[in-house]
């Protein structure tokens, strides 16, 4: 879903400071840039909407890009899953987001609950709250797991 960030690595993860307005504008272009990559192969067509819509709000009234209507996508539920996961990762990881401080898992869950129905799919938020094993695993990943996950990706795909 974030393949478009490959085009903007000079903006992302570079400095220990807040992003400028221009840098934020460039980062907001990554869904469209990602779509360009995916259009190279017809086999990737089913990923177009999730790449384009993973920063749109559940209710379609916020997020970006403005001209994409996630509420009409046949892949809406997948967009909702990727959106929630992306927000959780962005908020809790310490690796690769030098421009902001990570949040606690509890704070992120509070934000997900607060945004349920507007920004996030309420059924997905409820699912996390209703399944203790899922909640605990997500909490473990948020607190300890990102470096291990990145190392596994490196071991399996980059070497």
Question: Where in the sequence are the language-model features?
Answer:
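Histidine- and acidic-residue-rich, metal-dependent catalytic cores
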Residues: 2-159
